[in-house]
Swiss-Prot record:
Record-linked CDD domains: chitinase_GH19
Source species: Solanum lycopersicum (Tomato)
InterPro entries: Glyco_hydro_19, Glyco_hydro_19_cat, Lysozyme-like_dom_sf
Domain of life: Eukaryota
Protein name: Basic endochitinase
Length: 246
């Protein structure tokens, strides 16, 4: 295994993919750096290093696409198109609530809010707690680190990407071809491909309801990034006919 994916995604490619993230209209201007991304990937050595070069590039494209959707500042007539505006934000927009759920293992810290932050917009105390434990940072007490420290921010997104949360597989295992659907997955239409990753992330809102703008936006980012990285996006890109997990 290579411990570094910079041989596949150079700083120049990273800038082409996330071309407008430092636009003055973006709330996270200057936050998401290439160096922070590469540093964070070293904590998750299998990311972007599993399988052949085509598979590795597809994983990078899929990760950056899903997280670009979560952080997009794009709109239909945006300069260079809506899929050039990923990584525009590092915290949930509007007036988000506390996102505090009852948990013995990961109790909420007084006065802290666990709304969406970072590339995957990690939410809820139980995700902040588990992610922090995995990367060695106390995020229950310091959730704002995910919007203030770019390396920590990328690490939370990579933790979510690499970690299976039953009954869901990890996005990593799906995109690298290591997930084989069970009978319980196949019957509801959950098949390997980019679409089931959308199901993992937000299936309850976006899947099994035909075509919708949110799901299609994720696919749009993925197609653009695959084109830049020179890989075929593969089959089963949507989850229109997939029932959510669980």
């Amino acid at each position: 295994l290579s411990q570094n994916i910079s041989s596949l995604i150079s700083k120049n490619l990273f800038e082409r993919i996330l071309v407008h993230r430092n636009d003055r209209a973006c709330g996270a201007k200057g936050f998401y750096t290439y160096e922070a991304f590469i540093t964070a990937t070293k904590t998750f050595a299998a990311f972007g290093t599993t399988g052949d070069t085509n598979t590795r590039n597809k994983e990078i494209a899929a990760f950056l696409a899903q997280t670009s959707h979560e952080t997009t500042g794009g709109w239909a007539t945006a300069p260079d198109g809506p899929y050039s505006w990923g990584y525009c934000y590092n915290r949930e927009q509007g007036s988000p609530g506390d996102y505090c759920a009852s948990s013995q293992q990961w109790p909420c810290a007084p006065g802290k809010k666990y709304f969406g932050r970072g590339p995957i917009q990690i939410s809820y105390n139980y995700n902040y707690g588990a992610a922090g434990s995995a990367i060695g940072v106390n995020l229950l007490n310091n959730p704002d680190l995910v919007a203030n420290d770019a390396v920590v921010s990328f690490k939370t997104a990579l933790w979510f990407w690499m970690t299976a949360q039953q009954p869901k597989p990890s996005a990593h295992d799906v995109i690298t071809g290591r997930w084989s659907p069970s009978v319980a997955d196949s019957a509801p239409g959950r098949v390997p491909g980019f679409g089931v990753i959308t199901n993992i992330i937000n299936g309850g809102m976006e899947c099994n309801s035909g075509s919708n703008a949110l799901m299609d936006n994720r696919i749009g980012f993925y197609r653009r990034y695959c084109q830049i990285l020179g890989v075929d996006p593969g089959n089963n890109l949507d989850c229109a006919n997939q029932r959510p997990f669980g």
